[in-house]
């Protein structure tokens, strides 16, 4: 090649390099622009697409006002470790704007801090804005002052209501935007909800209901925040808003989105039933919850939210009428933020199993086969690949069924679904729990409970207030959500010859009330009490009363247990005495309701003076504990309980009232309202450690007791633990889903040892000190209540003690060889174990400590691997759309 040719070649090479460099830079710029365009959340008929990536969303409801900022980090950490990637919360209008135009975002109400903390922990947020939330929360989250806005009607096409709602919505969303908390700004909020379960009331408002719901949808969409919006239980969710399901079994009850390009979202999967005073205990099994989740995802579901994941506490006066202070205690994280096992662990495992199916669920084609009256297979296959995931379902509630799928037999326990992420390997069954179980215990703090000395201050009973009305006033209007109490007084003159002559006849005072409770005094003497219930707020007080000749003064204390939280025309709900009469007079029944002067006084003296605070307590004269009359305040000081365990106060032989610690409202208690089982609905009441001062310091406890004759001596402070842990694993169960991982389209084992194991772990810093029960055979019962069957391996306890005592973590192979057992070959055997954990003084055996640490690190590595695998599997939206178009 000549010199000139070489020069021309070099020149062309340089030119080509320059061109390629320009193309590369343009490509990078374009790629960068594409990434910027991907920021935010969109959706299609398959799922939400977050920052360009599809996600299976496992969400849990955690309400910031129902726990404390001190508790938030632990709760969010446990949610993340439990397999959640999203936290859902309502926004509580009435705590943020208790008075019109005056806002509160401090302490438990610091919404921004809560959302930022969730973001720091790597989770998404779903924000349910209201304005109405229900949530068994006082007034459904609507501020009381809204009732007194002229011409207002809630939740309809009413200008005053819409005006205040829009101002509130713009206030909250403006705060979120200013703090850059929306996903489109790089924040965690991926989804918003406006209104709540509106279909339940829409018919009551006729065409104005439809107009209102369209107005609400337009309001949030017009703000262009870069996230989708949902309406739950709103079949006709307008425009681009997604209609979502609430319920226990949305996989079977939800007809699906109202447009084919909207994803299937489940905003409330109820983990239990909320409780009201007078209720017996209720629960929802984790097997049923897991079944519902697997069923939903097998039918094109891509998002589930557990309502609640942590219920927490209705502190102060925040609960709706008759709702207990403890809220959704049977959730995966209980009232105290402790893991309720096996609910916590078994749901963690279903999340992991479903994540192993993600490729097939997003990019596979659904096929379904009905194999019998109760059995079904639903599976997703991606054409041209080996990607496949199957859900084998047995809906029979009594019988086990065997089915054949792709040439292989599978045994399905009753009412269960098996998940096969590769259409071959069972990694999880909803009815077979390999996760740990636990039992909660309340242990009396002897040091704190000992020697409590109470002082008392009794309320003055107003005998006759200045008459301000000819009829009794409405109780909500009188109290204005500032207090639960309002006095009604009137007088009646009875002539001597109007009393009955016949022996045994007495005059009766009858008070018909719209709710919720009342206490009656006649001439300053206690005459009795009465109350309604959640299902029937109205009730009647009717008792014989010793009226005197001449003027008689009647004092009635109307009592609320919270404001209503649901239904149409909430602004027109009423409570309090509605009809008052005296029966048994010679002259006949005397009606005192109308044309009788009634005086009214909202609140109690102790409330107005804030005797539950240190400063306020100095404004009244406290006396030594003596005769325990109704409407009495009791005060004592107690030392902060030892250790770090959660704390509660046990109100065993008390009646009904309110509790404060260091001036902070713990909540309403009601021990005298017994369930059909003859027990109070709630006995222990949570006192967060952040409400108390440091260890060994004194705290002020104040109790307002409405009823007479209570036993203060029965009050205890208790420490809460879940130090009793159990395992209950059948030898025919699949190995833990944590034993599997995905490599491309394949599901492969994580380790060489793939034997089924019963695994238990004590709380941090504790070790197993006692094996309380062990049986490999046919034991019955549950954690805390196991019973030996007829066939149990003789070495059961010996084997468990050898493997577990002195350790924080232990695993036992569930096999006959482990126990040297050849008996009862005809039965499928179960290993049931119950052990006690304690914090032991002195050093743990170093070998066991190292083994425990290795096991813990292995668990953490499993979680990290799962996240890495998810990252590999995520593809951008364009690729997924191209794939769908090709199909």
Curated annotation (Swiss-Prot):
<feature type="glycosylation site" description="N-linked (GlcNAc...) asparagine">
    <location>
        <position position="269"/>
    </location>
</feature>
<keyword id="KW-0964">Secreted</keyword>
<dbReference type="InterPro" id="IPR019801">
    <property type="entry name" value="Glyco_hydro_35_CS"/>
</dbReference>
<feature type="glycosylation site" description="N-linked (GlcNAc...) asparagine">
    <location>
        <position position="785"/>
    </location>
</feature>
<dbReference type="GO" id="GO:0004565">
    <property type="term" value="F:beta-galactosidase activity"/>
</dbReference>
<feature type="glycosylation site" description="N-linked (GlcNAc...) asparagine">
    <location>
        <position position="300"/>
    </location>
</feature>
<dbReference type="InterPro" id="IPR000922">
    <property type="entry name" value="Lectin_gal-bd_dom"/>
</dbReference>
<keyword id="KW-0378">Hydrolase</keyword>
<dbReference type="Pfam" id="PF02140">
    <property type="entry name" value="SUEL_Lectin"/>
</dbReference>
<dbReference type="GO" id="GO:0030246">
    <property type="term" value="F:carbohydrate binding"/>
</dbReference>
<feature type="signal peptide">
    <location>
        <begin position="1"/>
        <end position="31"/>
    </location>
</feature>
<dbReference type="GO" id="GO:0048046">
    <property type="term" value="C:apoplast"/>
</dbReference>
<dbReference type="GO" id="GO:0005773">
    <property type="term" value="C:vacuole"/>
</dbReference>
<dbReference type="InterPro" id="IPR041392">
    <property type="entry name" value="GHD"/>
</dbReference>
<dbReference type="Pfam" id="PF01301">
    <property type="entry name" value="Glyco_hydro_35"/>
</dbReference>
<dbReference type="Pfam" id="PF21467">
    <property type="entry name" value="BetaGal_gal-bd"/>
</dbReference>
<dbReference type="InterPro" id="IPR048913">
    <property type="entry name" value="BetaGal_gal-bd"/>
</dbReference>
<dbReference type="Pfam" id="PF17834">
    <property type="entry name" value="GHD"/>
</dbReference>
<dbReference type="GO" id="GO:0009505">
    <property type="term" value="C:plant-type cell wall"/>
</dbReference>
<dbReference type="InterPro" id="IPR031330">
    <property type="entry name" value="Gly_Hdrlase_35_cat"/>
</dbReference>
<dbReference type="InterPro" id="IPR017853">
    <property type="entry name" value="Glycoside_hydrolase_SF"/>
</dbReference>
<keyword id="KW-0732">Signal</keyword>
<feature type="compositionally biased region" description="Basic and acidic residues">
    <location>
        <begin position="872"/>
        <end position="887"/>
    </location>
</feature>
<feature type="active site" description="Proton donor">
    <location>
        <position position="197"/>
    </location>
</feature>
<keyword id="KW-0052">Apoplast</keyword>
<keyword id="KW-0325">Glycoprotein</keyword>
<dbReference type="InterPro" id="IPR001944">
    <property type="entry name" value="Glycoside_Hdrlase_35"/>
</dbReference>
<feature type="compositionally biased region" description="Acidic residues">
    <location>
        <begin position="853"/>
        <end position="871"/>
    </location>
</feature>
<dbReference type="GO" id="GO:0019388">
    <property type="term" value="P:galactose catabolic process"/>
</dbReference>
<dbReference type="GO" id="GO:0009827">
    <property type="term" value="P:plant-type cell wall modification"/>
</dbReference>
<keyword id="KW-0326">Glycosidase</keyword>
<feature type="active site" description="Nucleophile">
    <location>
        <position position="268"/>
    </location>
</feature>
<dbReference type="InterPro" id="IPR043159">
    <property type="entry name" value="Lectin_gal-bd_sf"/>
</dbReference>
<feature type="glycosylation site" description="N-linked (GlcNAc...) asparagine">
    <location>
        <position position="395"/>
    </location>
</feature>
<protein>
    <recommendedName>
        <fullName>Beta-galactosidase 14</fullName>
        <ecNumber>3.2.1.23</ecNumber>
    </recommendedName>
</protein>
<comment type="similarity">
    <text>Belongs to the glycosyl hydrolase 35 family.</text>
</comment>
<feature type="compositionally biased region" description="Basic and acidic residues">
    <location>
        <begin position="838"/>
        <end position="852"/>
    </location>
</feature>
<feature type="region of interest" description="Disordered">
    <location>
        <begin position="838"/>
        <end position="887"/>
    </location>
</feature>
<dbReference type="InterPro" id="IPR008979">
    <property type="entry name" value="Galactose-bd-like_sf"/>
</dbReference>
<feature type="domain" description="SUEL-type lectin">
    <location>
        <begin position="752"/>
        <end position="838"/>
    </location>
</feature>
